[in-house]
Amino acid sequence: MNIFNGVTQFSIPDRTVVTFGKFDGIHMGHMALINTAGRIAREQGYKLAVFTFDVPPTLHFEKFEATQITTNYEKRKMFADAGVDYLVEYPFNENTASMEPLEFIRKVISGNLNAAHVVVGSDWHFGKDRSGNCDVLMAAQKLYNYEVHIVEKEKFEQREISSTWIREEIQLGNMENVNILLGYPYMIIGNVEEGRHLGKEMGFATVNIYPSPEKLLPPYGVYASKVIVDGEEYYAITNIGVRPT
């Protein structure tokens, strides 16, 4: 997977099928976009591209909080596993945020991304003050030689799946609901830290994981889990909170 991180001057030589999103928490709705774009890319012989931002737009305007359901590292891994050929992590700053919708279409969608097909959600907005929408995107498709595909929002129990909803469930510790809404098990990927080896004294293996600081964690408590080490899966009990071992 080719990655363009934090740059505005780049060019993709291949014609692409591209989908857009903040992808602040990759859930069933996001996977519907990626899967639709991937299917079109395979059928048409184009490359699959994902466009997102190097930092979530909310972090640009607000103080830092641990609110990411899916960290940047986790997102990259999931995109690669989904067969994405090009990942664009576009810089979000005053200059790029003030880009008019038609300028964004001309410079980025048609220019940088070399898009043949554009796959977006029905509520997608882009450009200065979020003034661009699906109607604007479709109005320009003939001029810039791309085709628009609109994917409806995924729902669970008649409610639209959103990152906001998933954050609420994580903060409540409703991890079964979280896994349903994500479409895969909630995960924590982190570095191993040296502990006090108390688990060894009690006759079972333990490992202390330090998660990424932007990762949104469930409440302190003990959770049934699986641990993957060097590709091997183990059933485990995970303690979220002050390390006991």
Predicted features, each with a name:
Residues Q9-T71:
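N-terminal catalytic cores of NTP/NDP-binding nucleotidyl/phosphoryl-transfer enzymes
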Residues P57-E62, N95, E160-I161:
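A short acidic, helix-capping loop that chelates divalent metal ions and anchors anionic groups
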Residues E74-V88:
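A glycine-rich helix N-cap at a beta->alpha junction
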Residues N2-T8, V88:
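Short acidic-hydrophobic, aromatic-tinged amphipathic segments that line or gate anion-handling sites
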Residues G195-T245:
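Phosphate/ribose-recognition catalytic cores of enzymes acting on nucleotide-derived substrates
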Residues H27, F79, V118, V178, ...:
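Residue-level signal for inorganic ion chemistry
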Residues S98-A205:
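Classical nucleotidyltransferase
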